[in-house]
Amino acid sequence: MQMARLLGLCAWARKSVRMASSRMTRRDPLTNKVALVTASTDGIGFAIARRLAQDRAHVVVSSRKQQNVDQAVATLQGEGLSVTGTVCHVGKAEDRERLVAMAVKLHGGIDILVSNAAVNPFFGSLMDVTEEVWDKTLDINVKAPALMTKAVVPEMEKRGGGSVVIVSSIAAFSPSPGFSPYNVSKTALLGLNNTLAIELAPRNIRVNCLHLDLSRLASAGCSGWTRKKRKA
């Protein structure tokens, strides 16, 4: 009788441990995952980086300015989060390579990429957009996310897969007046996302596109949206 009770208690204990472990896995799926977030020292990018770190991921933030990186890292580390950072202009190959190399050196690999960097150097009619503005907008908003993804895929494959999140805008579906080249670039990101999703699925890498509305970007103080709206 006592032996039966003991065996029953052991079985109950094993079941409880399995259930607790399962709950922990579901609750903290990002524990010890490694995430890169571009343009992540303020606004939406900073909020994404903070949330990933709060969910126990190791996060590498980036910005074009060292002082912004230092401030963001100090703030998030002050909250007890696992965050490091480096300067990265996503339009420069050497900066993209450094960002990837830092994550691999510090944490052994990469599981998550959030491509958040974007610019809007022009406000007005599409007919007034110069070639220089087109080049800058498409280089940062479209080409850079594609090349960042290309840079991290080999590292994700080494870890059995990963996740890429491309931050786009509701402008991909409903163009906002005045944000002419920006609207086009964000629509292009939808095509990039869909193509990458098909190509990378066999490698167990998910690709998703996040479409934010401009009011959310403005409320987060992102990229001068509020200032440009006032000028308009």
Swiss-Prot record:
Q: Does the keyword Lipid metabolism apply?
A: no
- Protein family membership: Belongs to the short-chain dehydrogenases/reductases (SDR) family.
Role, per record = Probable oxidoreductase.
What enzyme category does the UniProt record give?
oxidoreductase
Assigned EC number: 1.1.-.-
Further comment found in the protein's record: Three homologous proteins DHRS4, DHRS4L1, and DHRS4L2 are derived from gene duplication of DHRS4, and the gene cluster is arranged in tandem in chromosome 14.
For this UniProt record, the keywords arranged alphabetically read as follows:
Glycoprotein, NAD, NADP, Oxidoreductase, Secreted, Signal
What organism is listed for this UniProt entry? Homo sapiens
The residues that the entry says bind NADP(+) are: 36-60, 186
What InterPro entries does the record tag this protein with?
Answer: NAD(P)-bd_dom_sf (IPR036291), Sc_DH/Rdtase_CS (IPR020904), SDR_fam (IPR002347)
**Where in the sequence is the signal peptide annotated?**
1-19
Q: Where in the cell is it found?
A: Secreted
> Which residues are noted as glycosylation sites?
N183
> What is the superkingdom listed in this entry's lineage?
Eukaryota
The answer to whether the entry has keyword NADP is yes
Q: Active-site residues?
A: Y182
Q: Which GO terms describe its molecular function?
A: carbonyl reductase (NADPH) activity
Q: Pfam families of this UniProt entry?
A: adh_short
Name the chain's protein. Dehydrogenase/reductase SDR family member 4-like 2
Q: What is its main location?
A: secreted
Q: PANTHER family in the record, alphabetically? A: DEHYDROGENASE/REDUCTASE (SDR FAMILY) MEMBER 4 (PTHR43943), DEHYDROGENASE_REDUCTASE SDR FAMILY MEMBER 4-RELATED (PTHR43943:SF8)
Q: Which GO terms describe its cellular component?
A: extracellular region; mitochondrion; peroxisome
